[in-house]
Amino acid sequence: MAATSAEIEIFTGLPAPAPPRPRVLLVGAALASGSVAMVLGTLVAIYARLRSDVIAGGDAWVPEGGVIQLTSGNMGMVTLIMSAVTVAWFVYSLRNDDRPHAYLAAGLSILLGVAYIPTVVYGWQQLGLGAADTPQALMIFAITGLHVALVGVGLLFLAVMGFRALGGQLTGRAAEGANAAALFWYVTVALYAVVWYAITIVK
């Protein structure tokens, strides 16, 4: 009986564990998403201002020999929209402990994200201008190149969360990592919508 009392005293004397920090990864992803949105938004604003100045001077924005293809931009937009749907499916499946569908959704999301990159590369090839040829080409390459880099980061984020889900670390309401990856991906898709409209549609 004395031993039992001593054990109770020993265990009750231990310090309480540190409280868990809720949603740290989600908040970090939100801050990172906001930062990249400001950077890319600034570049698009500079692009729009330069375009307005050139057109106001009576010149064409796209110089002779340059072509901005609608096909590549539109395909890129459609591909990313589909990937946003599959990312939402990934998060939904994890929250409902539907692991087979979560793995399928993660794989499809990564596949669609990778498929977006060749559409941008094709647009660069069809542009007919090098990055150093004109200020217009430099801005187009800078904006679209930065967005491809963001997609690469988003794909890496999704891949890491997919492997964590495969290892059983993301389950039910504890799937904060999947929510964080999805948030970053949604912002990336929304940013491409801005880029697509400013460069491909408005030209």
Question: What is the meaning of each model-derived region?
Answer:
Residues 1-203:
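...captures the hydrophobic TM-helix bundle architecture rather than a specific catalytic motif
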